């Protein structure tokens, strides 16, 4: 199949790259190996939460923080993508979210500080409206509300953790649990089931009545796991707030993440309905290169290979979950050029025993040139017309610095611009 | 990360048993149309890879809930680790049926070709019967086929018989009035006439039961469009593709059908491409004969099978598709069948239709229609199947369109039944642009 520009991947970097191409009037085809990393990793778009993965003090101004990072680390993917790409990509994403029907807030100027499901403060840059009332720079007392039988959010744990970090004056935290109609003990359910139920008006009203009965009249805001609707989030959230009479904020939970699902489903639908073709269920597994250019990539479609001949390619795979890399016992190999991206004597070298320490596997990826082309051992591009975006770029750990979203946006945007010029 | 064979034993474990590649991410459960619509269905993650760890050949299979899986394969389309979720469910379902015995309905719905042959032979009568409330009441009681589900009408003149006559006709091309009109408007020639023996390509058309017994017109359009492009068409001897047997817990029967088809298709010269106009039948030939049914030699034939729109788009890219389209002023919706997503070829029908002047085609992206072949026919699943499709029906109604295109025949039946709109194969528009009436 022929295409102008082929974007491989289904995460935020791939979507931003595709949108950038679409807005420039280019004809992009989006190739998916499976569902998106948005399902697993995103709720908010974090640009820079911590200057490095050992600092405790959160970054207050993400744009200024990235500028400093670029000055200190000229090899960092942010430095390669450039501050303009971060600005341009963020503006594009913000506008797109609005067009796709989302209500989001935040800017590169200032981070919000939002409580996580275990009650730790986390710096976030762009966030859905339904999360914003959780900002810990505000002083109103917080009530964490969990649900009986739902173990992905333990309100008592969140409250006791948050009380340690945040608890001066009015800043009081408490926890309560509600029993939900239809979710009796013994029923196996996930946040997705809850989110579907919250779209039902009668169910929502029942929960609101139950919650009002255990709340005092005083000023308080309610922190709930993010289950307020699967597709109609902003309506559900606004209506629920009305019914409660207090501000309500959602807290991202473990996968399957309702917030990630909302974001992904709607952006995907929007881009698809505006004319971008998506090739589902076809993992890419080889690139053909001649005279320094990639001539085609091969997808595994049903029964045979589907070659894609494009003028340029954006490899916007998001590391582990998108099948960006093939990990054997000793080697991690990329699926296109079959380069060894990392070699380990034993697989345990890839991991740190402490879950909360930086994980070596997180920074495995393609070394890239200053134009985001995948680089070979000699530092020269493996192919002139291929550009890497998102988590597949080597040399950074997006988890510790809370920068996955910003890097996806900046590199996705820049890779798309480069692909148009290639 | 997915392990690929890079040379050591442990690297191949996940490839050999993809159940090991499941990371429990639950993405499959979130897209499953059945799990979305009923809380009694545990979802593909639990019934597929998670239960698979507890299944073993000598033990009895726990089948509770397995029959609720509709077989849409969206779980496999979605899985970031390429776990063959659906195949685990199908195999377990089949083993359960072998242990417990199959129902009369399993037998009947697995043998749709036999039914169709009978329905076609007795065509006007069978169709009257299928609409008769008393007959339908009996069918519901005896067979478990829901009385509200419209059954497809059979036609007495099968596609295969039509094709024989078509072949026997003089090779003079039929120039329709429309293309005459086109000539008068001097928009150029309408393409060369059919010249038997001089075609560059030969295509074997796997028309499948649907076209043969129910929608001959679609087969005629396929032949028209291919011949219009200077391609010789043959219709090889064929059997049911086997998918009704697979989804009604009879994989042995499906395998028998598959072997018959492969025997016939293997006899074709190696340069003949095989084309199918039924999404799911094409997927059986391409992929499931080899992967699910393990039929020897299936991979080589599967690699030669194309969906009709996929094939035509390939011709277009090779510069071999005639572009002398008559404008078709129409605004249509397109519904992408779940099994088309499993093909991994994108949406070639939409690309093709956008070549035709006047055609505005918009995708209605509301997921599964709910019928899944024989699934939505069953008395205990009819309501569920309509609930699954309700988002699609609402979207079609909201779009105010009275015409929805879909490559899959049972999707078309369901869209018509649920939304009241007319539904056709995308080829209908293409054939019209080529002057077919």
Residue locations for each model-derived region?
Chain B
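Iron-sulfur cluster-binding electron-transfer modules in prokaryotic oxidoreductases
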Residues: 85-437
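Non-heme iron-sulfur electron-transfer modules
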Residues: 1-7, 11, 34-64, 82-107, ...
């Amino acid at each position: 199949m022929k295409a102008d520009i082929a974007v491989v991947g289904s995460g935020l970097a791939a979507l931003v790259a595709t949108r950038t191409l679409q807005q420039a009037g280019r004809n992009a085809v989006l190739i998916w190996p499976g569902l998106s990393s948005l399902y697993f990793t995103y709720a908010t778009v974090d640009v820079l939460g911590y200057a490095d993965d050992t600092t405790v003090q959160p970054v207050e101004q993400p744009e200024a923080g990235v500028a400093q990072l670029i000055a200190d680390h000229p090899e960092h993917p942010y430095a390669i993508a450039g501050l303009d790409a971060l600005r341009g990509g963020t503006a594009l994403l913000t506008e797109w979210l609005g067009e796709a029907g989302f209500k989001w807030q935040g800017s590169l100027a200032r981070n919000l500080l939002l409580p996580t499901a275990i009650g730790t403060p986390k710096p976030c840059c762009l966030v859905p409206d339904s999360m914003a009332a959780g900002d810990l720079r505000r002083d109103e007392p917080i009530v964490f509300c969990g649900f009986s039988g739902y173990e992905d959010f333990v309100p008592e744990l969140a409250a006791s953790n948050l009380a340690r970090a945040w608890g001066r004056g009015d800043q009081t935290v408490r926890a309560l649990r509600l029993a939900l109609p239809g979710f009796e003990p013994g029923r196996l359910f996930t946040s997705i089931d809850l989110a579907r139920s919250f779209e039902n008006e009668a169910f929502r009203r029942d929960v609101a009545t139950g919650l009002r009965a255990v709340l005092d009249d005083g000023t308080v805001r309610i922190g709930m796991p993010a289950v307020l609707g699967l597709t109609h989030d902003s309506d559900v959230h606004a209506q629920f707030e009305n019914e409660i009479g207090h501000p309500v904020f959602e807290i991202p939970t473990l996968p399957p993440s309702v917030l990630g699902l909302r974001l992904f489903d709607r952006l995907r639908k929007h881009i698809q309905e505006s004319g971008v073709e998506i090739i589902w269920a076809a993992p890419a597994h080889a690139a053909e290169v001649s005279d320094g250019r990639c001539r085609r990539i091969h997808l595994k479609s049903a029964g045979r290979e589907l070659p894609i001949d494009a003028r340029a390619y954006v490899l916007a795979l998001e590391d582990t979950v998108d099948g960006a890399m093939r990990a054997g016992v000793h080697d991690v190999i990329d699926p296109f050029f079959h380069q060894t991206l990392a070699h380990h004597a034993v697989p345990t070298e890839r991991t740190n025993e402490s879950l909360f320490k930086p994980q070596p596997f997180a920074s495995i990826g393609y070394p890239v040139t200053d134009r985001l082309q995948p680089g070979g051992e000699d530092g020269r591009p493996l192919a002139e017309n291929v550009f890497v975006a998102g988590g597949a770029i080597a040399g950074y750990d997006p988890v510790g610095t809370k920068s996955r979203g910003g890097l996806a946006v900046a590199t996705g945007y820049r890779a798309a611009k480069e692909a148009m010029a290639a | 990360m997915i392990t690929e064979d890079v040379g050591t034993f442990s690297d191949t474990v996940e490839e050999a048993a993809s159940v090991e590649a499941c990371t429990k991410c639950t993405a499959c459960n979130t897209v499953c149309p059945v799990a979305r619509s009923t809380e009694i269905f545990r979802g593909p993650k639990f019934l597929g890879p998670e239960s698979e760890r507890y299944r073993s050949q000598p033990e009895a299979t726990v089948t509770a809930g397995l029959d609720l899986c509709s077989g849409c394969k969206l779980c496999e389309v979605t899985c970031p680790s390429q776990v063959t979720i659906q195949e685990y469910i199908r195999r377990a379902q089949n083993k359960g049926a072998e242990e417990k015995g199959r129902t009369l309905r399993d037998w009947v719905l697995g043998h749709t070709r036999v039914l169709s042959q009978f329905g076609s032979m007795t065509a006007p009568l069978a169709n009257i019967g299928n609409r008769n409330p008393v007959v339908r009441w009996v069918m519901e009681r005896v067979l478990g086929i829901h009385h509200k589900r419209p059954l497809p009408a059979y036609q007495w003149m099968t596609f295969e018989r039509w094709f024989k006559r078509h072949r026997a006709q003089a090779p003079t091309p039929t120039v329709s009035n429309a293309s005459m009109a086109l000539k008068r408007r001097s928009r150029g020639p309408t393409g060369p006439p059919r010249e038997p023996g001089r075609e560059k390509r030969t295509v074997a058309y796997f028309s499948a039961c649907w076209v043969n017994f129910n929608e001959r017109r679609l087969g005629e359009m396929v032949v028209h469009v291919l011949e219009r492009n200077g391609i010789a068409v043959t219709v090889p001897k064929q059997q049911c593709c086997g998918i009704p047997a697979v989804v009604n817990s009879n994989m042995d029967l499906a395998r028998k059908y598959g072997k018959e088809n492969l025997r016939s298709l293997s006899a074709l010269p190696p340069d003949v491409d095989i084309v199918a106009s039924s999404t799911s039948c094409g997927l059986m030939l391409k992929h499931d004969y080899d992967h699910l049914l393990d039929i020897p030699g299936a991979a080589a034939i599967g690699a030669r099978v194309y969906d009709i729109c996929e094939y035509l788009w390939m011709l277009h890219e090779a510069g071999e598709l005639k572009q002398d389209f008559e404008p078709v002023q129409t605004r249509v919706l397109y519904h992408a069948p779940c099994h088309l997503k499993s093909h991994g070829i994108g949406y070639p029908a939409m690309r093709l239709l956008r070549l035709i002047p006047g055609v505005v085609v918009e995708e209605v992206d509301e997921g599964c229609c709910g019928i899944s072949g024989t699934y939505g026919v069953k008395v205990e699943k009819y309501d569920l199947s309509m609930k699954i499709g309700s988002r699609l029906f609402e979207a079609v109604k909201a779009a105010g369109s009275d015409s929805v295109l879909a490559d899959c025949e049972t999707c078309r039946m369901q869209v018509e039944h649920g939304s009241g709109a007319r539904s056709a194969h995308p080829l209908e528009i293409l054939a019209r642009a080529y002057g077919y009436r």
